[in-house]
């Protein structure tokens, strides 16, 4: 079993991404805490959007977007594809300043992290962007 083999979408691109829309137009998301880590689930509003979402939401891109919450030394992002649900799971490690009652942050459980991620621009073909406006 290799999780990467369950995500065949990287070979499905047949059109060029020549427009950009915020992730919220393509997906819904929910976040919460796992100790000192935050979990963000991103679910495509349409299965056809998932390849574009996955192409854009690499761990490196999410680290750059969410750098303000990640521990500068130990913070990192892991990503998994969730087969059958047209979704991705992102784990932001060491993002909660200790988490729960140990954290001095305004959002110690990371409940607003999904809303922050939903603003990230996603490159899509123009015909998809036109459907969403």
Model-derived features: where do they sit?
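Metallocofactor- and cofactor-centric catalytic cores in central/energy metabolism, strongly enriched
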Residues: 13-133
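Single conserved hydrophobic/aromatic residue that forms the stacking wall/gate
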Residues: 1-11
